[in-house]
């Protein structure tokens, strides 16, 4: 297991410096190959009442990129260190896709720190086929690109049938010192993340939690099938399922207003102890 100093993690906190009574901070965890700015449409509508933390998780964005150590537990331990550094006693966990697996592991390992869990298009079933998909995807992109125009043209031409994914990947390019564009994440770490996070079933871990949980599913998502979502919603008390029509896997980006509304309502109910 590799150790990342929480002080070296790139993060931003939006909202009040003094925590209002009977509220908890919100932690937004991006998905695989994502970064903190992915939540740019969400935190502005949440931070008026409570602090909202966004961060680049290990191997992503501006945070440290160890050669190995990309299990859900590695990510969760990083977050625990950061939460303790900030002096927070409890927080709401919100995770998209891979970030959902991290949030789930955090709640499982440190239940005393978790006020609630929200999984955005993030299921508990094993998906070992995603390992090969990620390997082939990363191998297919001819990084580094000479300039941003070349990169944009390549993603436009090769993701005509999936412009949302193409745009997401294009946003994950950064300019290197030599002027060329390359991934802002550690590619081998992304493969290890999928190998350790999606190749195994996490249903028992999810069912063992005892905190209020919101499942947000994109109505057209293939990543989080309706049958799997219903199975998770029915496995224990305190699990609530919201399906947002017209959204795919990136619910918070495709239907930001609807996603934020569902999340904010859930957080209010948790803090008012009405669920």
Predicted regions and their residues:
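Residue in the alpha/beta-hydrolase core beta-strand immediately N-terminal to the catalytic nucleophile
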Residues: 56, 92, 115-118
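Conserved serine/cysteine hydrolase catalytic core
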Residues: 178-234, 240-243
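Flexible "cap/lid" loop of the alpha/beta hydrolase fold
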Residues: 105-109, 115-148
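Conserved acidic catalytic loop of the alpha/beta-hydrolase fold
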Residues: 76-91
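Conserved HGGG/HGGXW glycine-rich cap/lid loop of the alpha/beta-hydrolase fold
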Residues: 12-62
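Catalytic histidine-centered segment of alpha/beta-hydrolase-like enzymes
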Residues: 247-256, 260
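Conserved alpha/beta-hydrolase catalytic His-Asp/Glu region
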Residues: 129-132, 144-200, 205
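Gly/Ala-rich beta-loop-alpha elbow adjacent to hydrolase catalytic centers
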Residues: 95, 99, 103
């Amino acid at each position: 297991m590799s150790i990342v100093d929480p002080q070296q993690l790139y993060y931003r906190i939006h909202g009040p410096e003094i925590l209002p009574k009977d509220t908890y901070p919100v932690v937004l965890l991006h998905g695989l190959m994502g970064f903190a700015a992915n939540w740019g449409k969400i935190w502005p509508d949440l931070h008026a009442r409570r602090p909202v933390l966004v961060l680049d998780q290990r191997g992503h964005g501006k945070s440290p990129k160890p050669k190995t150590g990309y299990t859900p537990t590695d990510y969760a331990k990083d977050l625990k260190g950061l939460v303790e550094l900030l002096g927070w006693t409890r927080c709401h966990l919100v995770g998209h896709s891979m970030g959902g697996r991290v949030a789930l592991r955090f709640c499982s390992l440190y239940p005393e720190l978790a006020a609630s869990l929200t999984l955005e298009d993030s299921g508990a079933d094993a998906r070992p086929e995603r390992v090969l998909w990620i390997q082939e995807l990363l191998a297919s992109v001819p990084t580094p690109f000479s300039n941003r125009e070349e990169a944009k043209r390549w993603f436009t031409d090769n993701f005509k049938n999936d412009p949302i994914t193409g745009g997401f990947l294009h946003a994950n390019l950064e300019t290197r010192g030599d002027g060329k564009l390359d991934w802002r994440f550690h590619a081998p770490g992304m493969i290890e993340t999928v190998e350790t996070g999606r190749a195994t079933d996490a249903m028992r871990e999810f069912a063992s939690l005892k905190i209020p949980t919101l499942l947000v599913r994109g109505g057209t998502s293939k990543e989080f099938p309706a049958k799997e979502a219903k199975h998770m919603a029915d496995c224990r008390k305190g699990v609530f399922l919201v399906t947002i029509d017209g959204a795919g896997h990136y619910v918070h980006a495709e239907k930001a207003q609807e996603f934020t509304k569902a999340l904010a309502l859930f957080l209010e109910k948790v803090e008012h102890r009405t669920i």
